[in-house]
Amino acid sequence: MDNRKKLYGVVPPMITPFTEGGELDIPGLEALVDYLASEVDGLFICGSYGSGPLMSVEERKIVAETTLRRAAGKIPVVVHTGAASSRDAAELSAHAASRGAAAVSAVGPYYYHHNADGVLAFYRAMLAAVPRGFPVYVYHNPRFSGYEIDLGAMKKLADEGARGVKDATFDIMKFALYQRELGETGFDVVLGTESMWLSARALGAEAYIPG
């Protein structure tokens, strides 16, 4: 994905196959990527559906490398790099960028209660870990992070280089607010559910990550 372009179309959150023993199922992962590559417009990996938070950093790197290698030249891949620590998120983001990801995205830091400054510091660490201009998406999912990221903080992140937001608030009014206040500046507001697609499309949405 060109740094200036937005995500487009249907970008499903891909599951991560495991063996019965709990190990990564690499042949299954490769087969899944091969199947989806001709059916959708992009892939979102290692997110909630992809069991990202349940995997080690090394396992997540293996999933990213395998998916990116298999999808190369076919469809863009967005790698979810969210973690409880900014150190892990930065490491995973740098790795994904170096392996050919179209973008990275991360749910904000979780488990502990974070104030606005802590959330901003988390995403700044991600931005600092990737090449300048590389697409970094905020994954706004209050159900899992435990807090809302307010419009002021989102504007700061946009000003500092964040490429867009995956809005998983399931609140069409929140989506409309982001689209009105940030979408016209080039900030990519991506819908994080298929259930509101028609309304979001009318508001200017160009992509959704169903879930």
Short names for language-model regions:
Residues 1-2, 166:
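Intrinsic-disorder/low-complexity regions
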Residues 1, 95-96, 156, 199:
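A general structural signal for stabilizing positions within well-ordered secondary structure
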Residues 2-146:
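Active-site beta->alpha loop and helix N-cap motifs at the rims of alpha/beta catalytic domains
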Residues 128-131, 142-211:
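Catalytic alpha/beta core domains of metabolic enzymes, predominantly
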